[in-house]
Amino acid sequence: MSSVDLDDLVEKICALDLCSAAALVEKIEEKLGFPKGGLMASVSAAGSASQGAGGAAEAEKTEFIVMFDGYAADKKIAVIKAVRECTSLGLKEAKDFVEQEGSRELIEGKKYKKAEAEEVKKKLEDAGAQVSLK
């Protein structure tokens, strides 16, 4: 593959929205034969094994649910756009989702890896949403 092809590939990857990028990572991990849960899960497991029987260290949580808790009224449009970027919702569905009362899962049943959850949380908070991770 030439450097021009690689540059084009990098540009296309950088243009992906967050959800598409996550799907790409999962497909690459699957293609390369990484264990379920990805490379970070195997690195974490190796780190835990190296601690030995010296103590029962609490396992760090690796999967998170992104909870949408609300938004700043003056940032409604930006929040709707951010929700659309982070989900596969259309404009009307994203608007309805944002306008619902109470705390709810961003994508019902979806568990994010820590880095991805933090990225989604930051994107939504930058837009004006109140978000928590569970």
Swiss-Prot record:
One of its GO terms (molecular function) is mRNA binding. It comes from Anaplasma phagocytophilum (strain HZ). InterPro entries: Ribosomal_bL12, Ribosomal_bL12_C, Ribosomal_bL12_C/ClpS-like, Ribosomal_bL12_oligo_N_sf. The keyword Transmembrane helix does not apply. Forms part of the ribosomal stalk which helps the ribosome interact with GTP-bound translation factors. Is thus essential for accurate translation. It comes from the Bacteria. CDD domains: Ribosomal_L7_L12 (cd00387). The gene is rplL. PANTHER family: 39S RIBOSOMAL PROTEIN L12 (PTHR45987), LARGE RIBOSOMAL SUBUNIT PROTEIN BL12M (PTHR45987:SF4). Keywords: Ribonucleoprotein, Ribosomal protein. One of its GO terms (biological process) is translation. Coiled coil: none annotated. Belongs to the bacterial ribosomal protein bL12 family. Homodimer. Part of the ribosomal stalk of the 50S ribosomal subunit. Forms a multimeric L10(L12)X complex, where L10 forms an elongated spine to which 2 to 4 L12 dimers bind in a sequential fashion. Binds GTP-bound translation factors. This is Large ribosomal subunit protein bL12. GO terms for cellular component: ribonucleoprotein complex; ribosome.
